[in-house]
């Protein structure tokens, strides 16, 4: 939990938040506090869900990113705009490549349980389920710099 006064202003070179921004109620205050904690050359590295990602394209509203706990949702354009508006520059937004065993992808994919159970058995017997599989499933990352005062 980020609390005001926990760290001195300008304390950090880099601040990372992975799947955090989408859960913050007062995002404007949070990003202002993050910015104040960065030193003058400080950078951020965030990862969030992508509303234009593959999971949304394949699953629509059934995509796991549409969750009551996700207060804010972003795509590359909206994340870039939000950060620039809040004093960040040199913003680079990019897709994240996720690598998990085929078992994981199968378990989270919304298919009928009877089919899923059969596929899991096949994957177990054949050992296919342990094969790592990489996919740009619907996460984006961003690296940005604290904008210098002009």
Region annotations inferred by a language model:
Residues 92-150:
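A C-terminal cap/extension of S-adenosyl-L-methionine-dependent methyltransferases
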